[in-house]
Amino acid sequence: MNSSSPISIDLIAEILSRVPSKSVARFRCVSKPWASMIRRPYFTELFLTRSSPKPCILFATVADGVWSFFSLPQYPYEKSSSASVAASAKFHVKFPPNNMRIGHNSDRRYFSYGYTSGLIYLYGDSSDDRSVICNPYTGEYAILPYLQRYRKTYSFLVFEPIEKQFKILFMAYLSGDRDHKILTVGTGNMKWRTIRCSLRYEIVSEGVSINGVLYYLGETSAWDNKDYDLKYDYAIVCFDIRSEKFIFFEIERFCRLINYKGKLAVIYFEDDVNYQSCLYRKKNYVEPDAINKLNVWVLEDVEKQEW
């Protein structure tokens, strides 16, 4: 009688989630089931949770198109302690491999990188650049299907927490009814699909993803959105990652979107400060004697638009 039994894949995942990232990268070569397990979003989440006893800050440096990824322990703030804490950064991996070009535009308005749930998205805005998804801990990556671009583009890496799927939302400028595309990462044959968005706008903010919904700010003043009775020049775009549907609601001024305790919040200055010019033109438009007030509004209900 054979008393031995195979180790379950869940137990293997539990064990591997506690080993160093370089070892995880090598374990992909053990077998196809192991390689498949390590690629799953579930394992990425588990590894980020179990591999370190303390929360970590992930950061990267870029030199000559090569990204170097590091992590740093995040120590809790102690108000009563005056002693400084010294910590050394842990190097993980360099990316991309040799002979692969990834464009990196230094202008934040082109959104040339994104991060969510343990994966990093890198893309360039020219036709020669390759778009990739990278695991900064193991160095594993996937090259995304080519998408023809002849206009300025925007895209976001998002994570759908129920089905645990990574998706990429892509938009071309000027954004029209058929200028939005979606790709589900990790499927056997990754393909871009066209999704419809009836509102025309230009993206003027970074994206904020909260509980399966992606939020970003759109400027609508340059287009005649005749199907909408718009009173203001800006709208917050809400993209449901699971259903792949858009909803919109107007906002009377330019603002910055943030995640505030698990809810969407907007912040903006009043009076003498042109915040949009300061943030996106990278110039100091603030007069020395400027009077301003910082406003913070938290969205309590998306459907009712209650703040």
From Swiss-Prot:
PANTHER family named in the record: BNAA05G37150D PROTEIN-RELATED, F-BOX ASSOCIATED UBIQUITINATION EFFECTOR FAMILY PROTEIN
InterPro entries: F-box-assoc_dom_typ3, F-box-assoc_interact_dom, F-box-like_dom_sf, F-box_dom
Stretch forming the signal peptide: none
Name under which the protein is recorded: F-box protein At2g23160
Domain spans labelled F-box: 2-49
Domain of life: Eukaryota
NCBIfam families, alphabetized: F_box_assoc_1
